[in-house]
Each structure stands twice: as structure tokens, then as C-alpha cells.
Regions:
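Beta-strand-centric surfaces of beta-sandwich/beta-rich domains
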Residues: 1-100, 107-203
């Protein structure tokens, strides 16, 4: 067991983050591992969030999700968390602006216990996060290190599953450096399996 990772999870070395995601339908072009599918578009400026569900049951007095908590960064890249009360298929605007959204989860629900519909979180009509129906939280392998923090990646894993034979997934771990350059830090090709790769040296 890596006891340093346990200590990090306890908060003894600052804060640990476990990021994971899922993409249900990847084709022959590169996509980001996240609920919405396609390539993730990072905002270039902080903006108000628009939060809406595809189902009317996700509302303040509904049987589905009633409130969602959104985690991300403000215009200064500082950590910011807000809770939004849903209004079904009617969009609700946040009072705060975000330049990054990297997680959202159902924080209050009715008798259904979680969200009934898909909950989209957007800025300027572009989806920045989505909670797929029944999932209760985002599944997005996307993260930005906040201002005044230093991030270290200690490993990654990737898996694929396909019903057809001879289907392969070419996956890579991408990091944006402080100068804005995108760097591939790990890459592997798999077919109907999962690869778990701890790094001997954190990156």
C-alpha cells in the first residue's frame, strides 16, 4: 500500500482529488471522457451558469433532484462552490460567475433519490458539465488546478468496452502546462479491458 496516498486522502498533504469520467459513445475522432461526449470546450472568460433538467421532476418540490451543488473556479481561478435549486425544464441562473466547472452533484432529492432527467450546466449555450439521468453526479475526467495550489498526478486508469470485435481505444492523459501548452503525459491502446497505471514519479 502507498501510505503517502492515504495521508494525502486524509488531508495531511493538502488535498487529494480523485477524478473519473465516462463517455458512452466514442466514435473514430478523439473525444473527452465526460458525460456530454465530444471534445470538452474550456471557457475563456468567467460567466453565469445556466442550470436546467430534461425532466420536470427535477424541481424544488419534485420527486427527482431538487438541488445541485456545483464546484469550479471563479474569475481569479479560486475555488468556488454554489448550490442551485432546480426548476425542472426551466433554466435557473447562478448568481456567481465561473471560468471553470469540474464537478456537480445532486445535493437534495425527492422520493426518487436522485435526478430523473439529464441536468445540463451551461454558459453561453455551451455545456460545461452534465449530470446524466439517474447518475447523481457528473462523470467528467476534467480538472483545473486552482490558483495558489500545485497539483500532482500520481496515476491514471482507462478502460473500454465494445460489443463489436476488433474495436480499439487509443487513450491519452493530457495536461495543460502553465504556458497553456497541451502535453500528452501517458498514452495506451486497449480493447475491452482496463489499464491501471500508477506513476513511479508524480507528474
Amino acid at each position: 500500500m502507498d501510505f503517502s496516498s492515504v495521508q494525502a486522502a486524509k488531508g495531511h498533504f493538502g488535498k487529494s482529488i480523485y477524478k473519473f469520467g465516462f463517455n458512452s459513445a466514442i466514435s473514430t475522432t478523439e473525444e473527452t471522457v465526460w458525460d456530454e461526449g465530444g471534445t470538452y470546450a474550456y471557457p475563456t472568460a468567467a460567466a453565469v451558469l445556466s442550470v436546467v433538467s430534461s425532466n420536470a421532476a427535477d424541481a424544488a418540490a419534485g420527486t427527482g433532484a431538487r438541488k445541485v451543488t456545483i464546484e469550479g473556479l471563479d474569475s481569479d481561478y479560486k475555488v468556488q462552490t454554489v448550490e442551485i435549486t432546480l426548476n425542472g425544464t426551466n433554466a435557473v441562473a447562478s448568481t456567481e460567475t465561473f471560468i471553470r466547472v469540474y464537478r456537480a452533484f445532486v445535493s437534495e432529492a425527492g422520493s426518487g433519490g436522485t435526478n430523473t432527467g439529464a441536468i445540463s450546466i451551461s454558459t453561453s449555450s455551451t455545456v460545461r458539465a452534465e449530470i446524466s439521468a439517474g447518475m447523481g453526479q457528473t462523470l467528467m475526467a476534467v480538472y483545473t488546478v486552482p490558483a495558489d495550489y500545485t497539483g500532482y498526478i500520481v496515476g491514471w486508469s482507462i478502460g473500454s468496452g465494445a460489443t463489436a470485435a476488433n474495436k480499439y481505444l487509443d487513450g491519452r492523459l493530457i495536461v495543460r502546462d502553465p504556458d497553456g501548452i497541451l502535453l500528452t503525459k501517458a498514452r495506451t491502446t486497449i480493447s475491452n479491458t482496463t489499464v491501471i497505471q500508477p506513476f513511479g514519479k508524480a507528474i
